[in-house]
């Protein structure tokens, strides 16, 4: 990269550098004295002084002569400035020694620097307007007066968070979610009603049946038939009971099968007596 830069700069600035050197057209038969040579060199340097700026000799950077150990005394340093389309200028400094050193500097034009100086001067005037008042009260006063407040980096923590960072969902999406929730609640309530109504009906039916069975048991325990009561009542004045057998018996002979057989007994059950009376 240094070699390419050197070639580029040499192609741009070498014509001007060569103009510094004395150009003498010598005829083959003409000889120039030393005085004329130095006079022409001084004239050339005076003509190019408007383009190039001379700087002080830099003795520390000058190389030494290895044979004699002395430094070169005739050392000159030239600075080249070239403007760019962006409004900046590049500086190239050349030292006229055996070692050529190129240094480039970029800096803005004088207009830009002047505007920068004005901005720097205006900033401390704003800060020094209220040096003794706390920052909170100045901010409060500016907020009341509806003036713009210059916030520092530390004050950015107290600013409100924008709504886009908090929630990225739209109102339409929120309304759709609410509708889904309502539908779920209605579905759950309908399912509970469908399950509870048959359960309640079954409970009422079982209770009614149990009550009806209890009433039947009470009636069967205390019911009295008056006919059976009169028939089952024992009368001692009648004497011994007689049972009449009217049924035909296979054990009797056929001659006596149609007769009535009377069986006398002192002890007869009440059930047999009732049956005989009913048959009469």
Curated annotation (Swiss-Prot):
Q: Which residues carry this modification: Phosphoserine?
A: 279
Predominantly, its location class is membrane
Source domain of life is: Eukaryota
Protein name stated in the entry: Equatorin
Cellular component terms, GO, for this chain's entry? cytoplasm; early endosome; inner acrosomal membrane; nucleus; outer acrosomal membrane; plasma membrane
Q: Which GO terms describe its biological process?
A: acrosomal vesicle exocytosis; endocytosis; establishment of localization in cell; fusion of sperm to egg plasma membrane involved in single fertilization
For the keyword Transmembrane helix, the answer is: yes
Q: Does the keyword Transit peptide apply?
A: no
Vesicular membrane side: 20-183
Originating organism: Rattus norvegicus
Q: InterPro entries of this UniProt entry? A: Eqtn/Afaf
State what this protein does.
Acrosomal membrane-anchored protein involved in the process of fertilization and in acrosome biogenesis.
Q: Which residues are glycosylated?
A: 145
Outline the segment boundaries, as ranges, of region: Disordered.
112-131
Per UniProt, subcellular location reads as: Cytoplasmic vesicle, Secretory vesicle, Acrosome membrane; Cytoplasmic vesicle, Secretory vesicle, Acrosome inner membrane; Cytoplasmic vesicle, Secretory vesicle, Acrosome outer membrane
Topological domain ranges for the Cytoplasmic compartment: 205-280
């Amino acid at each position: 990269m240094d070699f390419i830069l050197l070639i580029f700069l040499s192609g741009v600035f070498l014509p001007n550098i060569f103009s510094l050197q004395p150009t003498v057209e010598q005829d083959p038969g003409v000889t120039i004295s030393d005085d004329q040579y130095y006079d022409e060199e001084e004239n050339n340097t005076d003509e190019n002084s408007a383009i190039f700026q001379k700087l002080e000799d830099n003795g520390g950077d000058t190389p030494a002569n290895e044979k004699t150990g002395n430094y070169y005394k005739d050392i000159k340093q030239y600075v080249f400035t070239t403007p760019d389309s962006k409004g900046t200028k590049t500086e190239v400094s050349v030292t006229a020694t055996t070692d050529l050193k190129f240094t480039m500097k970029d800096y803005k034009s004088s207009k830009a620097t002047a505007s920068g100086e004005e901005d720097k001067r205006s900033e401390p005037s704003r800060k020094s307007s209220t040096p003794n008042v706390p920052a909170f009260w100045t901010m409060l006063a500016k907020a009341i007066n509806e003036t713009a407040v210059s916030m520092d980096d530390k004050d950015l923590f107290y600013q409100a968070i924008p709504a886009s960072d908090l929630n990225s969902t739209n109102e339409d999406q929120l309304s759709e979610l609410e509708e889904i929730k309502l539908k779920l609640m209605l579905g759950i309530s309908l399912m509970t009603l469908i399950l509870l109504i048959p359960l309640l009906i079954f409970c009422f039916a079982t209770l009614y049946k149990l009550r009806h069975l209890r009433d039947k048991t009470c009636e069967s325990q205390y019911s009295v038939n008056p006919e059976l009561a009169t028939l089952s009542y024992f009368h001692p004045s009648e004497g011994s009971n007689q049972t009449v057998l009217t049924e035909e018996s296979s054990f009797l002979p056929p001659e006596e099968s149609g007769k009535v057989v009377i069986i006398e007994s002192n002890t007869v059950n009440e059930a047999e007596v009732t049956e005989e009376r009913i048959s009469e």
